[in-house]
Amino acid sequence: MSQIIWGAYAQRNTEDHPPAYAPGYKTSVLRSPKNALISIAETLSEVTAPHFSADKFGPKDNDLILNYAKDGLPIGERVIVHGYVRDQFGRPVKNALVEVWQANASGRYRHPNDQYIGAMDPNFGGCGRMLTDDNGYYVFRTIKPGPYPWRNRINEWRPAHIHFSLIADGWAQRLISQFYFEGDTLIDSCPILKTIPSEQQRRALIALEDKSNFIEADSRCYRFDITLRGRRATYFENDLT
């Protein structure tokens, strides 16, 4: 019983979640809602579908080092990221779709609107996907993204990060966020992270170095666990209610 009380569903806690309007994060000035939000009822198809099948995934979908390589390997530090997706009671969330996208080692995205002077890597696409197994486990291999400047304030840089999306039982439950890497000196000065008032919530978005799973002369490893719902939930950008 104590576990259920501790991990009970929680409405938005303003002490943990950032306000929609946060002037320090300049983009929120235009993007934050000006009117009261309207709740739309979910239909049965939205809360019960889709169900993903492993046979629809390619063998390289979760290998960002190889899934876009053309005439060589991408440049940069090779890393493995892995972890578990669990619900508020610690139970595994199996067959959840995890999607990731990121900048390359130079801090540049493969997107026509990204005009940063960082070099484009012809062998790196920067996106991947995978399903969690019966234990809620996921893993992918990639190149550690580089930091990049952004037009928030004068000379501000985003710390290295990877965006991720998670879909479990239905499209209406799609959750989106981004995680960072332990030891990055830009984390503490990031205006986006600063909008989250809870230190615990900020730290929950940092992937921890996992030296026990380093691959000798190949890759470093980071672990990032995701908790859905409840007071121990991972902070998601699009789930503020």
From Swiss-Prot:
Q: What is its EC number?
A: 1.13.11.3
GO MF term (any one): ferric iron binding
Q: Which reaction does it catalyse?
A: 3,4-dihydroxybenzoate + O2 = 3-carboxy-cis,cis-muconate + 2 H(+)
Could you tell me what the cofactor note in this record states?
Binds Fe(3+) ion per subunit.
| Superkingdom of the organism of origin | Bacteria
Q: Which CDD domains match?
A: 3_4-PCD_beta (cd03464)
Name the SUPFAM superfamilies on file.
Aromatic compound dioxygenase (SSF49482)
The keyword Ribonucleoprotein appears for this protein: no
**What cofactor does this chain's UniProt record say it requires?**
Fe(3+)
Which processes are annotated in GO (biological process)? 3,4-dihydroxybenzoate catabolic process; beta-ketoadipate pathway
The pathway noted for it is: Aromatic compound metabolism; beta-ketoadipate pathway; 3-carboxy-cis,cis-muconate from 3,4-dihydroxybenzoate: step 1/1
Q: Does the keyword Nucleotide-binding apply?
A: no
Matching InterPro entries: Intradiol_dOase_C, Intradiol_dOase_core, Intradiol_RC_Dioxygenase, PCDO_beta_N, Protocat_dOase_b
Keyword entries, A-Z:
Aromatic hydrocarbons catabolism, Dioxygenase, Iron, Metal-binding, Oxidoreductase
Q: Which Gene3D superfamilies match?
A: Aromatic compound dioxygenase (2.60.130.10)
Assembly and interaction partners: The enzyme is an oligomer of 12 copies of the alpha and beta chains.
Cite the NCBIfam families for this sequence: protocat_beta
Q: What does this protein do?
A: Plays an essential role in the utilization of numerous aromatic and hydroaromatic compounds via the beta-ketoadipate pathway.
Family indicated by similarity: Belongs to the intradiol ring-cleavage dioxygenase family.
**Name by which UniProt lists this protein:** Protocatechuate 3,4-dioxygenase beta chain
